[in-house]
């Protein structure tokens, strides 16, 4: 009898050892879960239980955010069909993303349509209707956003505050705003980030194609920008973080825009801009300035009196070619006393327009 008991206990022990622990079963189920949502509220509340998320023909209610900021590490998010948003005057954002090792992508033929003309009044964020920001890519780490097709954002499209984020083959088409009052429709606004890599972007808008306000190790390559204010660093100053370091903007085109490439720092503020490269940028149809680097910026209009609290150093401008309009200025440099230094300036070939006689404090080797 005693021996039978021992055998029974041994068999029971082997069964217990062979069975997976409840936590492991639970982990396996969660890792493999795939969810398709057609309701915005359900997506926002339940996304954290899924490892693969499909957002199909989502209609986000007015005044609400499609909140995908609590997803699990490693989640894949796919937009399918048409994503739309109800109308309300508010600050937004309409979409919020966050997390680690997140992949955001889009099915063929899908679109995220902000229907921005409902808010457009020619004033952007400077008055008139309160307009929601479109997409916050904040607190993303080691993540990828690729292939998004975004249309008609009320104001700024993608706000980035992230570490090691890749944004690939993204289209932002606000061209309807040219005739319907679009304003401040920036493509990518980057701040407080380390490692942002944008490639293959196609942006049509009425403001900066990209605006880097702070951060380091930022790259923009293979982009096409049309209708806006060009490839910008700044405006720098007046924020919690006013340092830009390690920027490469290369192999891109800017057409039918106010400016080509631009660095602007706010007058009488402090900060720094360093280790910046603009290389192989082709310009055409530039209405105001092909290359503009100014230290007198102020919203509402430059002062004409540059300050030197935000030095701009270690800048390479190489291979900026193309043309500007007949009334435009090919190159305009306005630096504070001693605050622009160690620049490399070569292969700048811009035709058209009129040279400026108002350039000031140019670094060695640079000409207007």
Swiss-Prot record:
What Gene Ontology molecular-function terms does this entry list? galacturan 1,4-alpha-galacturonidase activity; polygalacturonase activity
- Pfam families reported in the protein's UniProt record: Glyco_hydro_28
Catalysis performed (reactions): (1,4-alpha-D-galacturonosyl)n+m + H2O = (1,4-alpha-D-galacturonosyl)n + (1,4-alpha-D-galacturonosyl)m
Q: Which organism is it from?
A: Aspergillus terreus (strain NIH 2624 / FGSC A1156)
List the record's Gene Ontology CC terms alphabetically: extracellular region
Cite the EC number: 3.2.1.15
Where does each PbH1 repeat begin and end?
162-192, 193-214, 215-235, 244-265, 273-295, 307-328
Looking up PANTHER family in the UniProt record yields: ENDOPOLYGALACTURONASE B, POLYGALACTURONASE
What is the recorded function of this protein according to its Swiss-Prot or TrEMBL entry? Involved in maceration and soft-rotting of plant tissue. Hydrolyzes the 1,4-alpha glycosidic bonds of de-esterified pectate in the smooth region of the plant cell wall.
Task: Supply the name of the protein.
Answer: Probable endopolygalacturonase I
Sorted UniProt keywords: Cell wall biogenesis/degradation, Disulfide bond, Glycosidase, Hydrolase, Repeat, Secreted, Signal, Zymogen
Q: Which residues form the propeptide?
A: 19-31
Provide the disulphide bond pattern: 35-50, 209-225, 335-340, 359-368
| GO BP annotation list | cell wall organization; pectin catabolic process
Family classification? Belongs to the glycosyl hydrolase 28 family.
Q: Localized where?
A: Secreted
Q: Which residues form the signal peptide?
A: 1-18
